[in-house]
């Protein structure tokens, strides 16, 4: 079973979110926990098993993951792509979930007040230096 946490985030009722850890999961060997990345050399079947467990646990259809590029690239998530090369993504499609993977960078989850749009950001120093986030 994948370990996950809820944070105290005041979001509209139609927004679901969670934070998982690598503490448990279906991965093997040096990736023996809940690895969701095909970028590190793990058997893709184990990664797929971890992703499918998340989908089942939360009743999700499509999850779009970021292949973090340490850039200021922002893309719209869609069903056509399971992985996008970017450091921020968003969607207005209620059937798509956005996922950000981090190690030593900061994951940021965003929505607007009505919950019409969701997004996530991989906030590393390179992306921040390139003005990935504008406030």
Tell me what each language-model feature is.
Residues 14-17, 33, 63, 97:
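A residue-level signal for beta-strand positions that form part of recognition/binding surfaces
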Residues 17-53:
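Intrinsically disordered, low-complexity, positively charged segments
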Residues 44-123:
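Phosphate-centric recognition/catalysis
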Residues 1-19, 23-24:
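Conserved nucleotide-ligand handling architecture
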Residues 129, 133-135:
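Conserved small/polar residues in nucleotide/adenosyl-binding loops
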Residues 29-34, 76-78, 131:
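Short, glycine/acidic-enriched capping/hinge loops at junctions between secondary-structure elements
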